[in-house]
UniProtKB/Swiss-Prot annotation:
Part of the high-affinity ATP-driven potassium transport (or Kdp) system, which catalyzes the hydrolysis of ATP coupled with the electrogenic transport of potassium into the cytoplasm. This subunit is responsible for energy coupling to the transport system and for the release of the potassium ions to the cytoplasm. The keyword Lipid metabolism does not apply. One of its GO terms (molecular function) is magnesium ion binding. The keyword Iron-sulfur does not apply. The gene is kdpB1. Keywords: ATP-binding, Cell inner membrane, Cell membrane, Ion transport, Magnesium, Membrane, Metal-binding, Nucleotide-binding, Phosphoprotein, Potassium, Potassium transport, Translocase, Transmembrane, Transmembrane helix, Transport. The system is composed of three essential subunits: KdpA, KdpB and KdpC. It catalyses: K(+)(out) + ATP + H2O = K(+)(in) + ADP + phosphate + H(+). NCBIfam families: ATPase_P-type, kdpB. It is a multi-pass membrane protein. This is Potassium-transporting ATPase ATP-binding subunit 1. PROSITE patterns: ATPASE_E1_E2.
Amino acid sequence: MNPVAPTRKVKPPRNRPSDRRQARKKARIKTKGIYLRAIKDAFVKLNPKSAIKNPVMFVVWVATLVTLAVTINPDLFGPNQQKNPQLFNGLLTGILFFTVWFANFAEAVAEGRGKAQADTLRSTKSEAIAKQLSPDGTIAEVPSTNLKQGDTVYVVAGDIIPADGEVIMGVASVDESAITGESAPVLKESGSDVASSVTGGTRIISDELIVRVTSDPGKGFIDRMIALVEGAERSKTPNEVALTVLLAVLSLVFLFVIATLPAFAYYADTPVNVPTLIALLVALIPTTIGGLLSAIGIAGMDRVAQFNVIATSGRAVEVCGDINTLVLDKTGTITLGNRLAEEFIPINGYSVEQLASVAWAASVFDDTPEGKSIVRLAEKLGIRYDLDPNLAQAVEFSAKTRMSGTNLPGGREARKGAVGAIQGFVRSRNGQTIPELDAAYERVSQQGGTPLAVCLDNEIYGVIYLKDIVKSGIRERFDQLRRMGVRTIMLTGDNHITASVIAQEAGVDDFIAEATPEDKISVIQREQAQGKLVAMTGDGTNDAPALAQANVGVAMNTGTQAAKEAANMVDLDSDPTKLIDIVSIGKQLLITRGALTTFSIANDIAKYFAIIPVIFAAANLQSLNIMNLTSTNSAVLSALIYNALIIPALIPLALKGVQFRPLTANQLLQRNILIYGLGGVIAPFIAIKLIDILITLVGLA
């Protein structure tokens, strides 16, 4: 291939105060746009095809048409003895119309947030010109939409990466803020399972890369995310479907009750007209939760999206609320990751300098953070192995051998790795291990570090102490999960002693030491066999089977394509700890739905006492008029006005969610019954009475 001239480095722009003010202004404009679009969409949703999807609100929709007909012709269902029936029926029609419209508005606002996110993602796509590399090394400029899987492209500083792909040559900094919102550039390089993955629409800000395209047009990561976000409102979760069926059954029961009332009213010599019966029906059916149910589900996905996580469906978010077990990798989730060499511990009569020299040789080709830290620590001591890298051969780490190193000139072998693996290697070369190694191993392990043994041929020189730090506050977060009934299991490749020390410090419930990728699937299957729901995170190709097996699998955006496709959530920030937040959001979704359902049903009690006593006042039920409402008209209008206004009043709560507290199921139930059950009874009594007073003052009673 023709040589490419080096490019100058481009500094990423800094966030100035004016930039932040502009960002806040854009956020306000975006919110205003969401509400303006929702107002329009709420009218569009009045069409019968949309209305019938919500059985409860469809009843109100039909009731609105009936009262409209009665407003036009008050004697439609027989002679009407009511004073000024057209005014009353007209007011009734208007209130019912706005009840349906407010429910549509709540759903449209929730959907609008998803559409806004889809628009943001869509804006990252560009019709850029790509520099396509042909097999003979020549560069041809083609539209990015013409690229297909398997093509190779060349990108330099300032270019937009034209399609999803894998880096096959080069090292560069990439700005992924258009997707993740994180301004810090991300290093991309070839030869890494994770850092070699790039996303179309991101921008390269320094150096250059050669990328192999991994997706066809319209099937890239951003395309899939747009499809997921825009399709969020169309798929109901199983719990949402079950609750919808329950609300529909309750509505049918109340419809049957209302249908039988005229006969009882005739027997009691207290005739009831059709508009009043319709008002009673609407007041009794659970319109509050019926109007907010879709918004709650869609908002759950939106709250996850605000954490920069894309869920494949509402079901994935909801399942998070029922999670019993979290399977977590130690490195990067529980600890800070990037273990660094802290100390050389020589044994067997060797000096620190001799151990550092062999460790340097075993790590000179190791590009991992751990390997580079070993080289740095040795060079800090002024130690290097006398080695010509051109005459040496790298030995890559593998999960099977659990060690890596260098084949040196003259047939010598420098290795570093797990203590057990190095012991086996030395024995296979007719060497011997000594008790001093076990003492060094235990010393490092008891400090929560990772011991790496170092050998040259059949002689063990000592142990490298790799230091890892448990993230601050992680123990408190695990305590919160435990109070919610969620069990945590830590997986680590460390030995049993190190794993035990870190598990105790972090406060996890269980751990698996010296874990392999197969252990992830085994522990998930074991937990699922006990009837538990399991969540886990992963980023590598070897994590894909476990991500697919888990009930909730969260793939890192920096992970491989296989991991993203196997998971049902993708974290754009690639932060494994976010799984804990996602579980909390799932539980908040379920709690919000339960709380508003409780509030809605409790509301019916107050509305019952508002309307029934005044309708059947002649049947000696006036004593039940404990609110002392002025008249039948004022009672009906007051109850229905409250019934309509409570829906927009609760939209912020439905979108934001009920405040989440890490409590047990019984404690949550008691709290919700007290706040939303008792509150759902008391609030309507007060509100309906105040509305009745206002109606009386304006002369509509």
